[in-house]
Amino acid sequence: RKLEAGNCCKNCAAKLSPWFNDRRQSTVEEIKEQLAYREANKEKVAAFHITRTLGEDTKVLLDEDAGLFMVTASRNLADANPDVLAFSDVTGCKLDIDERKTEIEYRDAEGKRQSFTPCRYAYSYDFYIVINVNNPYFNEIRFQLNDSAVDNDAETLLDGPDAVRPMRGGTRPG
């Protein structure tokens, strides 16, 4: 794996924090420092006492007695070695929403795709939490909240310009 001035073997790259993304701009010495940090982190993981779990797939694990947390999707904490951080390392938190829109079209009498006027769209969303942290190797932890896109299940190709999309959840009161 390429570094700013040198290389990092595949085994060492796998030991780096999953939240670290500046490998190519790092020196060999900086990588060695992070590997030492990650090795010391194993002891923190072993001593971590989960008092609360937040989330389904990716989880925020809290050790409220020690004021620590970690974020991981792994069931085997010893193997995953998730970064153990202090509550005081958190500098901010936000919800990040990725929106995608797909144009809804219809087939005309000749079977060709046509756009509505004005254009109609189907939307889907993915929701992410971004936890900003004070850490020498990464400054944010970003993970997806939903396990599949949240959408309105709209058909994006209708049989004709007068075709009506079924509404989910019934109608809204007047």
Regions found by a protein language model. Give the residues of each.
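Amphipathic alpha-helical segments
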Residues: 84-92
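Anionic N-terminal interaction surfaces
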Residues: 3, 13-83
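The −1 position to Zn-ligating cysteines in a subset of zinc-ribbon hairpins
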Residues: 8
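Acidic, Ser/Thr- and proline-rich intrinsically disordered linker/docking segments
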Residues: 91-174
